[in-house]
């Protein structure tokens, strides 16, 4: 039976679109499937660190202000009675600015970028499962059904075939689950909720992070596990949310939407986060972290982005790593395409797992240790109270948490972080 493409990518989020883009750039025929019709909303903080900005630049994505992007110069941190502003570091490896753009338009930009590179995009196509070759046990395609905007069936089932399938289908990953790749319980798991507000400070140049969440008046009530964020979007609105992380797959037992409401009652008044200015409901999502589903590649099926649990335990960012994974996946697939034998092609595809483990495995292990420490609110309070006033400590913390440091060379802070990622066991 003939293949429909060299590679099928399931899911049009950042990881899937990046995979499709790079595969198309390498001259491969690509089929990108997504059940939604773009633009569509996704729960996210919408803020991008310099690491994500670098990945977008590598893809050739334009992020001009007139196209709805806003740049940020660093992180404003509030906690322990302190309020400090930490500029993004000047490094050779990364730009010295971050970005923000609502996911509704951000994902559409990336899908269209992949389409322009030559990927065939089928929207409104819900993948229902993998096609598995009976003799080899390899994934050789997917089954799917057309759906309307409400997810209702809109046509007959269809089958698509390709020698490689990439699962970029999110935290639940129907494809990964269907072949027995379940989530690991020993990896961190986060939870985040967010909404949007109109605000006069929509063009604020700093990503604001609140390291302490109180269940009432700050300093006079109980500390809760988690952190809050305010990311200005430059379009009259800001993304406002809070998150929490657990060192295992068992989420903390907190009503986050209720906590969000209480936090907003004591939010900085200058932001004008009032019920009248809120746009849409508070929505939540799980944040799979630290490679919580493995193997990243086996028997024709690759995992990228949330399907592989690639969110950083340090800061809850997943986009940068999804884009990076898409780049690495496409490189492995392109190399496999030109190999003369099945064994040689398989060796090339397996380099994806090794590459991602080398790039991020040590960092994610450090992140797990970090989460074990800060998941206790009392420890977080002590760290912020005594750590924030110390410039060298915060320089180290910013680079570690944002994963923005020189991977080789650099100053003493860069060398310490790079060294730590190499001496711990890779996730």
Where are these regions (language model features)?
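Beta1/beta-strand and adjacent pyrophosphate-binding region of the FAD-binding site
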Residues: 2-15
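Conserved Rossmann-like nucleotide-cofactor binding loop
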Residues: 15, 38, 172
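Glycine-rich FAD pyrophosphate-binding loop
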Residues: 24-44
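Conserved N-terminal glycine-rich FAD pyrophosphate-binding loop of Rossmann-like flavoproteins
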Residues: 37-59
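A conserved beta-strand/loop capping segment in the N-terminal third of enzymes
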Residues: 53, 58-108
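FAD/FMN-dependent oxidoreductases across multiple families
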Residues: 68, 246-332, 338, 344
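Predominantly flavin-linked oxidoreductase catalytic cores and closely associated redox partners
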Residues: 113-270
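C-terminal helical "tail/cap" subdomain of flavin- and related membrane-associated enzymes
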Residues: 334-427
């Amino acid at each position: 039976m003939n293949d429909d493409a060299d590679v099928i990518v399931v899911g049009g989020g950042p990881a899937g679109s990046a995979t499709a883009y790079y595969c198309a750039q390498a001259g491969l025929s690509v089929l990108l499937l997504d059940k939604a019709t773009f633009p569509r909303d996704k729960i996210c903080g919408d803020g991008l660190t310099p690491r994500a900005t670098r990945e977008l630049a590598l893809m050739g994505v334009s992020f001009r202000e007139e196209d709805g992007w806003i740049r940020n110069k660093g992180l404003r941190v509030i906690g322990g009675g302190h309020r400090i502003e930490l500029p993004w570091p000047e490094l050779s490896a990364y730009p010295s600015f971050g970005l923000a753009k609502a996911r509704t338009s951000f994902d559409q930009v990336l899908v269209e970028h992949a389409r322009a590179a030559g990927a065939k995009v089928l929207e409104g196509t819900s993948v229902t499962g993998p096609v598995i070759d009976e003799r080899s046990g390899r994934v050789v395609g997917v089954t799917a059904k057309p759906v309307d905007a409400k997810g209702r069936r809109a046509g007959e089932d269809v089958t698509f075939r390709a020698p490689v399938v990439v699962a970029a289908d999110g935290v639940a990953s129907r494809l990964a689950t269907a072949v027995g790749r379940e989530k690991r319980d020993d990896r961190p798991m986060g939870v985040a909720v967010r909404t949007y507000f109109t605000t006069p400070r929509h063009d604020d140049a700093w990503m604001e992070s609140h390291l302490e969440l109180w269940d009432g008046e700050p300093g006079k009530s109980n500390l809760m596990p988690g952190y809050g964020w305010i990311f200005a979007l430059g379009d009259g609105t800001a993304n406002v949310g809070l998150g929490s992380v657990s060192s295992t797959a068992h989420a903390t037992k907190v009503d986050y939407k209720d906590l969000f409401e209480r936090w907003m009652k004591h939010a900085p008044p200058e932001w004008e986060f009032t019920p009248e200015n809120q746009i849409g409901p508070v929505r939540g999502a799980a944040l799979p972290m630290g490679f919580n589903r493995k193997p990243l590649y086996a028997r024709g099926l690759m995992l990228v982005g949330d399907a592989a649990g690639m969110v950083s335990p340090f800061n809850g960012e997943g986009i940068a790593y999804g884009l990076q994974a898409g780049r690495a996946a496409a490189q492995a697939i392109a190399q496999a395409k030109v190999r003369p034998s099945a064994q040689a092609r398989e060796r090339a595809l397996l380099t994806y797992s090794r590459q991602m483990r080398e790039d991020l495995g040590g960092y994610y292990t450090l992140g797990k240790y970090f989460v074990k420490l800060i998941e206790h609110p009392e420890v977080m309070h002590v760290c912020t109270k005594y750590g924030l006033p110390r410039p060298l400590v915060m320089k180290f913390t910013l680079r570690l948490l944002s994963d923005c440091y020189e991977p080789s060379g650099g100053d003493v802070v860069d060398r310490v972080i790079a060294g730590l990622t190499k001496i711990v066991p890779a996730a």
